[in-house]
UniProtKB/Swiss-Prot annotation:
CDD domains: RHOD_YceA (cd01518). Catalyzes oxygen-dependent 5-hydroxyuridine (ho5U) modification at position 34 in tRNAs. The keyword Oxidoreductase applies. Keywords: Oxidoreductase, tRNA processing. The keyword Magnesium does not apply. Signal peptide: none annotated. PANTHER family: RHODANESE-LIKE DOMAIN-CONTAINING PROTEIN 7-RELATED, THIOSULFATE SULFURTRANSFERASE/RHODANESE-LIKE DOMAIN-CONTAINING PROTEIN 2. It comes from Picosynechococcus sp. (strain ATCC 27264 / PCC 7002 / PR-6) (Agmenellum quadruplicatum). This is tRNA uridine(34) hydroxylase. NCBIfam families: PRK00142.1-4 (NF001136). The active site is at 177 (cysteine persulfide intermediate). It catalyses: uridine(34) in tRNA + AH2 + O2 = 5-hydroxyuridine(34) in tRNA + A + H2O. It comes from the Bacteria.
Amino acid sequence: MKDFVVITFYKFFDFPDYKERQQPIFNFADEQKIIGTILLAHEGINATIAGTQTALDAMVNFLHQDPRLADLTYKVSTAPKQPFKRLKVKLKQEIVTLGQPNVDPNNTVGTYIDPKDWNDLIQNPDVTLVDTRNDYEVGIGTFKGAINPNTKSFREFPDYVAENLDPQKNAKVAMFCTGGIRCEKATSYLLNQGFQEVYHLKGGILKYLEEIPVAESLWEGECFVFDERVTVKHGLETGHYELCYACGHPIDAEDKTSAAYEIGVSCPYCIEALTPERRSRFEAKWQQRQQMKACQAS
């Protein structure tokens, strides 16, 4: 069986008619049997979708017909199994939620650094390297020497900056995220706060893993992605993690050897929150899931 093709893309632009575009975009994607998530907001578009190469080419061509999206670019990877359950085209306040209405990457954004130049930048001792992703993502993999802000959501990032970074002490700041979109806002926010030299990895971790050979890489671990693959590694090959059915935290083979792991019920990251009521609920849901799989297979 051929792998599923996955593309990711985003663009910040003035999109006042985003609500009117929701149904046409959904209809076209649905006709092409595309699955995944497309987010629309006044500030732009953000998507990760999967399908056949022909269908995805048609989708991109459809979006390119809008002059505002004529220069839309995308990243391509593959998945060994269907990476999404359905198609969703959702209306949002932001295409990536920072909660800072004055931040506009269309007006102010950091300096883009290509993957081939990233290693030189982050090995500079004068550069403060910050991972803008959430704590559970950082725990799976990050760049050597990167700071983990220990955030549970991107909304907490401004608080981290206020408490830990200083424009005078941190003269050069480099940031990175999965595909680049969070850094668009993160770098814009830092520049608004008075930081002078702010850089971000163009195309994000995914582009780096796609282009940089393992022998030259400063990346350690795997990269969490928001689909059924869970993680990817160099070359964008599907990684070794899966999600705990109970709490949704990424788990690996070592986690599954823990006494805290019970399939469908708990893992080392949620065992402390497990109550008798939650156990009963998760056990029932797991049994229902297995019954549905058995029915689909018969």
